[in-house]
Amino acid sequence: MKEHSIDIQLSHPDDLFHLFGSNERHLRLMEEELDVVIHARTEIVQVLGEESACEEARQVIQALMVLVNRGMTVGTPDVVTAISMVKNDEIDKFVSLYEEEIIKDNTGKPIRVKTLGQKLYVDSVKQHDVTFGIGPAGTGKTFLAVTLAVTALKRGQVKRIILTRPAVEAGESLGFLPGDLKEKVDPYLRPVYDALYQILGKDQTTRLMEREIIEIAPLAYMRGRTLDDAFVILDEAQNTTIMQMKMFLTRLGFHSKMIVNGDISQIDLPRNVKSGLIDAQEKLKNIHQIDFVHFSAKDVVPHPVVAQIIRAYEYSTEVAHD
């Protein structure tokens, strides 16, 4: 196939560094992921390859240059997101992901959505009392939920954060683990702790938990309570029974928000027990202040090496089947 060439004019020599990063790591990433060759010379970027691949590279570079021209720092996750969006024919919406900063993490780094699915999710939480986030692992559901909860707490919109999940895990009975129920469920809430530590830092998280402003508890602890002025997150909701889900949702109090996250492809309940998450989708879809946001594989933005590992395993599986 005939090789195509595109020249892209930059506005300033410094743009090359801001665009491609130290040691041109972003340039190499674009070459690898888009199957093109890129030559960067002062204020001209030349892209070589098949016409469609060159066009994708041009769109990625121009989208990233919008961020550069706004004085924003372009990091590897931004490049990965742009590449993912151009492959999904969504690059025209890339810049909209950067219109709003949700909050800064404990190092001062801004936290923003990374995919259109994440943007829909954040917008839904702002507009609804109860938001269900349904989709595969790695889509950022837990991290975003905790981020939105901390943001609401810092703005004085709620007085406390409550994080919970059902005590069910694949192939493992919690009845055989030592300690009380809270101690048993805590190891399975690790993603929640990780998110809190990244956003608030470990010390502030610990202080807020000691003051019971942040509460991390098993789902069983929610029974009989009415949760006013609270931001309540239920994680791993696919493993709730119908009665557990009903019990949880009816805890909603005044001036509160609820997020229910789960992945219906990873249900660990006994085969004859219907998931409360699937049941809720069917029963609650027409309630005005409840919204369902569905994530897909497009919302998984892995590290470039992880993306290559996944592809290698997929290729290996295909070869094995041939």
Predicted feature descriptions by range:
Residues 1-18:
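Short glycine-/aliphatic-rich beta-strand segments at the starts of folded cytosolic domains
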Residues 39-98:
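Interdomain "pre-motor" coupling segment immediately N-terminal to P-loop NTPase/helicase cores
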Residues 19, 57-60, 245:
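Hydrophobic side chains in well-ordered alpha-helices
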Residues 88-109, 113-116:
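Conserved loop-to-helix interface motifs that mediate assembly, gating, or partner/ligand docking
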Residues 28-29, 34-37, 43:
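Compact, well-ordered interaction domains used in eukaryotic information-processing assemblies
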Residues 15-32:
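Short amphipathic alpha-helix segments
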Residues 2, 8, 72, 90-98, ...:
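Intrinsically disordered, low-complexity mixed-charge segments
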Residues 44, 106-234, 238-322:
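Conserved helicase motor core of SF1/SF2 NTP-dependent helicases
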